Amino acid sequence: MDTKIYHDEDADLNVLKGKKVSVLGYGAQGRAQALCFRDSGLDVTVGVRENGPSWKKAKEDGGMTVTTMDKAVKDADVVLMLLPDETQPDIYKEFVEPNLKKGAALDFAHGFAITYKLIVPPKDVDVIMMAPKAPGDAERQQFVEGFGVPALIAVHQDATGNAKKIALALAKGLGSTRAGTFEVDNFDYETKSDLFGEQAVECGGLSKLIETGFQTLVDQGFPPIVAYFECCHENKLIIDLVTQGGMAYMWNVCSNTAKYGGLTRRDKVINKDSVDGMKEIFRQIDSGEFKTEWRQEWANGLKNLHAMMDDESKLQLEKTGAEVRALFQRKAN
């Protein structure tokens, strides 16, 4: 499947000039996008809880209208839902749905609420996604340095005939068309691939691999600090190499011993059982089973999540990691 990649010449920021662009939420993603849009010359309104920490921060940043969410949505031409997945449905119902005008564009940075029909917008608005592929602080830093981070766009609903142009204009306002903005056919591709990556690889899979490797060496009598360096700390070196030049480049930089040992032993760790587990993870995402479980967890006050996070914080890996980080923070006398 070919993926179309767009650059600056493919996007027109004038599509948004003279329009009211309202950003709901002022966390890492909301603040980064709002500031970049502001610096790109757009008329930005930030919608947050009155007099809360985000309200005060947005006021301090300046150059934007700061107001409540309902007022931010009213008369807005573009509304960006830059809020946590779990809070979006309630905020949409209370503040967005009653105030969203006909012909407006509703933008998401993650497709969860649309994919699983937790939000069902009216047919007379555009529904788009502009999803930067980086955390908010990295987006802002790249923009300030005159570049941008790659982004993904998708159109779920094109009521005006301009939905794609608006999505590309938002990407340009963030600097993402300088890097490259790629288009997918629907929100599902972003939603399900993002969830899968988080659960099976980036957050779930990698953390478990690190924890298990560390504990294996400790159980064999190795000093925890040695186990930490080998099974956790040095992962950054490998990821940096892959990011810099790809997987083959990483292998070429490694010693011959590391190459041979890694290539001949990796299937003992990631094997058919692992593949079956990944397929089951995807099945639960694809069927909506994970969505239902996550919504129930949120409704129950995140009790299981808090308990699991507490358990993670007590791992020997965490204590050893703090000791290792302290070594790198020592200052010369």
Protein language model annotation of sequence segments:
Residues F222-N333:
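NAD(P)-dependent Rossmann-like dehydrogenase/reductase catalytic/cofactor-binding core
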Residues M69-I119:
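Rossmann-fold NAD(P) dinucleotide-binding segment
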Residues G161-K165, G175, G180-Q220, I225-T243:
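Active-site-proximal catalytic alpha-helix in oxidoreductases
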Residues M1-G18:
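A short, basic/flexible loop-to-alpha-helix module at the beginning of a structural domain
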Residues A32, R38-D61:
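NAD(P)-binding Rossmann-fold cofactor-contacting core
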Residues K20-Q33:
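Glycine-rich adenosine-cofactor-binding loop
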